[in-house]
């Protein structure tokens, strides 16, 4: 009986020791909606506008990099998303990026152009829950 109890104790302690110490955060559909009031140019084609100057990376073929929302610009990266589309509306260039990211109250946002050029980092920028768009559970609005 002592051997059985010892064996169960070893198995139980091995199970406790093997348990992960951190639980991965679930990833959800995330939209990054960008409004550029200056530093953009109208273009012909599928997209209606692109970023200029330091916002030149905001264009087709670019990516958005989300990192943990903090005042430090070197916070850990948590997601990378792809450019979806841009349009001009009421004199403002609107760009949309889609990604999968953990649910967080804030993010830092940076854009990477097709050639690897980087924009400044914007944030911390609050995220908001989304209930009206299937597949998208949060949105990050970046006004520039």
What are the language-model segments listed below?
Residues 70-72, 115:
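Solvent-exposed strand-loop boundary residues in beta-sheet-rich modules
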Residues 25-70:
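Short, surface-exposed binding/anchoring microloops in extracellular/periplasmic proteins
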Residues 75-89, 123-127:
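Solvent-exposed serine/threonine-rich low-complexity stretches and specific carbohydrate-binding patches
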Residues 89-108:
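Short Pro-Gly-centered beta-turn/loop motif in secreted/extracellular proteins
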Residues 122-144:
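Extracellular beta-sheet/turn segments enriched in Thr/Pro/Gly and aliphatic residues
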Residues 113-122:
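Short acidic/polar inter-strand loop motif in beta-rich domains
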Residues 18, 42-44, 87:
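Processing junctions and N-termini across compartments
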Residues 1-24:
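Secretory targeting and sorting signals
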